[in-house]
Amino acid sequence: MLNFSILGALEIRTPGGQVEIPGDLQRTLVQVLLAGEGRHLSGETLVEEVWGSAPPGNQANALQAHISRIRRRLRALEPERRPSRLVTNPAGYRLVVEDGELDAVNFVRDVQWAEEMLLSDPAGASRLLRSALAMWRGPVFGDLPGGPMCRMVAVRYEEQRLWAMELYFDAELSLGRHKGILAQLRETHIDHPLRERFCEQLMVALYRSGRQVDALATYQNMWKRLSEELGVQPSPSLRRVEHAILSHDPVLTAADATLRQ
């Protein structure tokens, strides 16, 4: 069994440790195949992802040479495996990844499970989300972002990461752990200043910590940023949180309430 990691720089691990894939071209090619998530990818797609607008003169031969090197490398890691993980047929190229072998797929699965658990078992959801978020070692694919397809996949996984963080903060707020996440929430809101849900969660955490003035100031700063940068007003959800703070709505201090609607 191999373990592939793309939530950060590409890593391939065997039971014996980490495996090196030499050269940026081969690393990028493996990343593209992993981004395909089991789909066949055409040679044209692989060439565009690896070489962009400057492909080699004989791109078909160059691609096949790198494919052959990767296939030999993978075969050396699993000499008993038949057929090869790297499949070639008229539809293109496909890297076979078994269930549980790709960290990004495992991450998305765990986040989905945690979302389903959130209302019935927020403590369990929080633990699962912490574990899932710990899979991330850096930006998807690290410092080799690849071509259009890889960049699109990276954006999708990054959005899943932010969603997981929202769910994690919801779980912690529902457990009454607002003080424990306050610093992390503030940092996350600074990193993603236009994401309203983080602002809502920070406002609730501040209010519960006895910092009503800071909670309202956070709203005002968000309102100003949305107006100046996007030309829009705060969402109804964000305005509801502000109104609840101004009216000292008891829902804000209920252990199981996060105002997500």
Where are these regions (language model features)?
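Intrinsically disordered, low-complexity protein-interaction/activation regions
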Residues: 1-183, 187, 250-261
